[in-house]
Amino acid sequence: MKIKLTNSTMVKPLSLRPTTNLWLSTLDIQMPTDYHVPTLYFYRFTGGADFFDPAVLKAALSRAMVEFYPIAGRLQMDNNGRIEINCNGEGLLFMEAEADGEMGDLGDFGPKPELGLIPTVDYSLGISTYPIVLLQVTRFKCGGVCLGVGYEHHISDGYSAIHFINTWSDIARGLNITIPAFWDRTDLRPQSPPNPRFTHIEFHASPQIKTPQNDTNHSDAVPHETVFSTFKLTRDHLNALKANCKDEDDDGKAITYSTYEVLAGHAWRCVCKARGLPENQETWLSIPVDGRFRLQPPLPKGYFANVIFTALPIALCGELQSNPLKFAVGKIHNAIARMDNDYLRSAIDYLELLPSEIDAHSRGMHLFKSPNLLISNWSKLPMYDADFGWGKPVHMGAGAIPPDGITYVMPNPTNDGGVLYALSLPKEQMELFEKLFNDI
């Protein structure tokens, strides 16, 4: 399938505010530069000549950016070399395109970066030259539409990104803004001077694989064919996992584990086994945790920023395999429970003390490669509420194939109580993972 670009516009706010610079917290500036997080929304054609009318979308976008004004700005470096947002109202990129095939030709709507459903920019020109948000509406021969979104992570996490997209869609339907954006990041400043109270191992170097260098099954030097798969777990599957995790605390009271905790425990065990890791191999599970309602006092509902911290259960691969599922699930439960106000405030201070050269790139993707894993929980996000007036999306998901070790729990679009689990693994590992994961 080929995509042909038909129009490109820089959409600006309907009205401009005085130019200001928005300070970014340490949670913001740790995000990688020169990268837009890609997501895709797919909509089936519902009839009518005005289906996904670009004029309607752009008019609503202009109105939305009055409230979400930093999104129309540009990244820049302040006098101390720290990233901030210049709220100059230059706007965001809105592109239109046509596909020579039908939406059904895409199959399961998995990531297809080769098609070009999301705009690209030239990062070599510097952080102040490209928009913070990139949008592309692609029409298929069947009438269906893909909305591709590229989102610069310095401005916020996924919770806030979806807040913006859903507010834009509400305005397109003629609704008023129900949750105003809250931009003041003062609540995320470190103490002066910073004084972390905990040792934050989540920012330390990750464990190395305990295999000989000539073991090509785990060597980064040997290319492996990576495959992406999405697995559906029904309500019955999830209930079966929970039934296998009945547990009690030290006082004999029953512990209730969440859907995410039991799924993450199951996935962690299966990935370690599929990778063929030795029993004495240490493995880290990175769990992104939203701090909005864990910090005290809780942050405002429309708090627009990166407020994601990392819970980090650690185990030996042999422990995960020799113990019942509730062993892994209990480690996950306890790591998440630890993420209270004191721990999160300490993490902010700890990040502030890290040398500036230890950025997201040097701390980043290696934390999630074998023997480690990251499981992001998107299952509670209102991903399917982006109705621009022509119905809700039939699919919303990642626009690029995630690297090995970065995985997602997502809501099922049918809202039937099940969830989806998406991940990438080397082909030979994926085949074994599928057998293990489906054995519930």
Name these PLM-found stretches:
Residues M365-I440:
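Low-complexity, glycine/alanine/valine/leucine- and proline-rich hydrophobic stretches
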Residues L22-L24:
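An N-terminal structural lobe/cap that precedes and organizes the functional/catalytic core
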Residues Q30, I132-T138, P403-N412:
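Short, surface-exposed beta-strand/loop micro-motifs that present aromatic residues
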Residues K2-T20, T33-M383:
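Soluble acyl-CoA-dependent acyltransferase catalytic core bearing the H(X)4D motif
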